[in-house]
């Protein structure tokens, strides 16, 4: 990150990230990609609660150290990914996941903002209690309603990544416009609902960025002055 910041010379911010303790635990319990073994992983968590708790506590300590190292190395912000939030039952989320979020965000350096991403954001009320500076939300969350619920919170999202992958440029423009309208252009970071899909055309990503820059300009402030500097 230090080398990247030197190369960028303050022109762009650098975002650090880490998988959440539960996301890492899913991979460790499955022994490989857990997507085909979700039921088995969830059954293990419930049946082996003490082992799961011990594993999550160890991973939480490691995650805090890892993210703080990234901040010390020059990350302007860090994001924690809860990649399987959409399949985790509420009781498991409350018992095992939420405590890791609260411990991590309370232990991070305050010199950089922190972002919490939970896939499709099924538990917004709990996300708001995590201690993160920013919440990255999925398609199931209406930005307008989220901001009414928590007017001081900064939300990130939530253009559908499928539109970028398979949509026309006109559809991408419309999606960005809708996202800005829902957010009211206040306390909002434009982004996707999730990562880029593998088959997303570069031209569509470029168009998304160009439209975001054009529609997201702050009145009276040149776009190049909006980025944080070192």
Feature map (PLM): residue ranges:
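Active-site loop segments of alpha/beta catalytic cores
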Residues: 2-230
């Amino acid at each position: 990150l230090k080398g990247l910041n030197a190369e960028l010379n303050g022109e762009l911010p650098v975002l650090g990230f880490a998988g959440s303790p539960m996301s890492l635990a899913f991979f460790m319990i499955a022994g490989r990609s857990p997507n085909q073994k979700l039921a088995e992983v969830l059954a293990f968590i419930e049946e082996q609660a003490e082992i799961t708790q011990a594993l999550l506590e160890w991973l939480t300590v490691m995650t805090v150290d890892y993210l703080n190292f990234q901040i010390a190395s020059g990350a302007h912000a860090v994001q924690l990914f809860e990649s399987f939030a959409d399949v985790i039952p509420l009781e498991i989320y409350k018992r095992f996941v939420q405590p890791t979020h609260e411990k991590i965000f309370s232990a991070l350096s305050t010199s950089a903002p922190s972002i919490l991403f939970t896939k499709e954001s099924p538990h917004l009320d709990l996300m708001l209690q995590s201690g993160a500076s920013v919440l990255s939300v999925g398609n199931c969350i209406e930005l307008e309603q989220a901001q009414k619920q928590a007017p001081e919170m900064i939300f990130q999202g939530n253009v559908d990544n499928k539109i970028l992958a398979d949509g026309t440029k006109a559809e991408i423009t419309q999606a960005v416009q809708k996202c800005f309208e829902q957010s009211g252009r206040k306390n909002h970071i434009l982004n996707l609902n999730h990562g880029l899909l593998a088959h997303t055309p570069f031209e569509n990503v470029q168009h998304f960025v160009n439209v975001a820059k054009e529609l997201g300009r702050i009145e009276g402030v040149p776009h190049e002055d909006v980025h944080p500097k070192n």
